[in-house]
């Protein structure tokens, strides 16, 4: 069965394009029916980021869930990992996050978590998809069995305490000037407050959401503003989150960016020294730099690679017993603490290493020299460009040229009509030639 609605991270698209009130209500009904298990009163928790369309989608979901007899607990703007944590903590049958993550405000999405706080499996998503294409009128609850909805107070404090408990009680961030960019998104209240409670001198930016400015020239996908602010304020470290705070990028005191691969190296080395790794290795995706793999190998640690998407990273972590994994983009999963990527908790682990070593972030967080890596995106309108003969031929030729000297990865995005062409190797000129040849075969200029 093909997937019409769900991508690699829930349902995502243009607000009032794909993501309409009608679809959101139907998603609430379908998911509510799938998760009505047992005879108890069923409940769902719903959080959101700060997009203007979040109001529309939130109320449509409420209508859908209550119409099939599920009670709804509304959390308001909260990080995605907080929604996952609260789903389990509040004994809910289902958790929902309204967000398009790092996308701009025009887009929105619906991602869901099961009762244990994990993202839904492909199998469960297919069950929901099947119901989305059916007439559900005869499956609605009787009038006396409709669900109720109410807003929950104090959820910010719950997440702050959860995040703080991931650090040793005796560890303080006193003496650190931390510049944090919340991308005008879901973390704009909780993260600056939590850092202040831990003793840091906090300089917050990206904390003035207006519904339209989420991720706009800020956050983990546009860290330039944070780099400038760190240098301007003489910060010790910068933390950039994305709109729903499930990914993080670090900036050192010189204003240089530290990506997810480097953060995985920092945490992996520290956890190995402390005996905290459950297995001698970590899980990352096919996008992670070969430099990370070599760094880990030198320390007798393995790197298990998965397809792109934090859900696939977590799947392998659970299957093989690893407790650390993540993506170059900044999705870091620490399964000792969380069931999904948590940008803030990951940043806290890095801050703990910085405090423990007492050295500048530039010395702590640049663990290896990354191999030259070229990534270009080709946006298309329709069709299947990767099925064309000339594209297949260009990919095969590129793989032969890089054989033994690097890697080539060509894949379709799971969330937008984009083909990503990534090459890496010791010879930057060769890598760029290979990538450009494939992009040319795809037919249009690429967007770097």
UniProtKB/Swiss-Prot annotation:
SS bond list: none
Residues passing through the membrane, by range: none
PTM remark: Activated by phosphorylation.
Keywords, comma-separated and alphabetical: Isomerase, Magnesium, Metal-binding, Phosphoprotein
Cofactor: Mg(2+)
N-terminal signal peptide: none
Alphabetized InterPro entries for the sequence: A-D-PHexomutase_a/b/a-I, A-D-PHexomutase_a/b/a-I/II/III, A-D-PHexomutase_a/b/a-II, A-D-PHexomutase_a/b/a-III, A-D-PHexomutase_C, A-D-PHexomutase_C_sf, Alpha-D-phosphohexomutase_SF, GlmM_bact
Chain sites annotated for binding Mg(2+): 101, 242, 244, 246
One GO process term, biological-process aspect: peptidoglycan biosynthetic process
Phosphoserine: residues bearing it: 101
GO molecular function, one term: phosphoglucosamine mutase activity
Keyword match Phosphoprotein: yes
Cofactor notes: Binds 1 Mg(2+) ion per subunit.
Active site (UniProt): 101 (phosphoserine intermediate)
EC number: 5.4.2.10
HAMAP family given in the database record: GlmM_B (MF_01554_B)
Function: Catalyzes the conversion of glucosamine-6-phosphate to glucosamine-1-phosphate.
Name of the protein in its database record: Phosphoglucosamine mutase
Species in which this protein is naturally found: Nitrobacter winogradskyi (strain ATCC 25391 / DSM 10237 / CIP 104748 / NCIMB 11846 / Nb-255)
């Amino acid at each position: 069965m093909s997937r019409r609605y769900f991508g690699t991270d829930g349902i995502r698209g243009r607000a009032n394009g794909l993501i309409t009130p009608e679809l959101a209500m139907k998603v609430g009904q379908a998911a509510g029916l799938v998760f009505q298990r047992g005879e108890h009163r069923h409940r769902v928790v719903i959080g959101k980021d700060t997009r203007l369309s979040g109001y529309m989608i939130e109320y449509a979901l409420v209508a859908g869930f209550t119409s099939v007899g599920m009670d709804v607990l509304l959390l308001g703007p909260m990080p995605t990992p907080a929604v996952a944590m609260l789903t389990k903590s509040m004994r809910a049958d289902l958790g929902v996050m309204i967000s398009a993550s790092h996308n701009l405000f025009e887009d929105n999405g619906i991602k869901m978590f099961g009762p244990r706080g994990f993202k839904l499996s492909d199998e469960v998503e297919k069950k929901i998809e099947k119901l989305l294409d059916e007439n559900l009128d005869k499956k609605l609850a009787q009038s006396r069995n409709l669900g109720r909805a109410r807003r929950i107070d104090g959820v910010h404090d719950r997440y702050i305490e959860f995040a703080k408990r991931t650090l040793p009680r005796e560890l303080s961030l006193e003496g650190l000037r931390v510049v944090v960019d919340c991308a005008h998104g879901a973390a704009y209240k909780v993260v600056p407050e939590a850092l202040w409670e831990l003793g840091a001198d906090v300089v917050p930016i990206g904390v003035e959401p207006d519904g339209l400015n989420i991720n706009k020239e800020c956050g983990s996908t546009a860290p330039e503003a944070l780099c400038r602010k760190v240098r301007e304020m003489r910060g010790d470290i910068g933390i950039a989150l994305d709109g729903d705070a499930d990914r993080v990028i670090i900036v050192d005191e010189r204003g240089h960016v530290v990506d997810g691969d480097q953060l995985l190296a920092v945490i992996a080395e520290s956890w190995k020294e402390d005996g905290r790794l459950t297995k001698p290795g970590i899980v990352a995706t096919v996008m992670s730099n070969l430099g990370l793999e070599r760094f880990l190998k030198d320390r007798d640690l393995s790197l298990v690679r998965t397809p792109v998407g934090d859900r696939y990273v977590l799947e392998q972590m659970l299957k093989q017993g690893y407790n650390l994994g993540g993506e170059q983009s900044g999705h870091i999963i620490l399964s000792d603490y969380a069931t999904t990527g948590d940008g803030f908790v990951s940043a806290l682990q890095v801050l703990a290493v910085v405090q423990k070593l007492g050295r500048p972030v530039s010395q702590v967080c640049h663990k290896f020299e990354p191999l030259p890596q070229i990534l270009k995106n080709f946006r298309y309108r329709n069709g299947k460009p990767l099925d064309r003969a000339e594209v297949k031929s260009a990919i095969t030729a590129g793989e032969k040229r890089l054989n033994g000297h690097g890697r080539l990865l060509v894949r379709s995005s799971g969330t937008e009509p984009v083909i990503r062409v990534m090459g890496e190797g010791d010879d930057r000129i060769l890598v760029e030639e290979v990538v450009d040849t494939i992009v040319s075969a795809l037919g249009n200029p690429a967007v770097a």
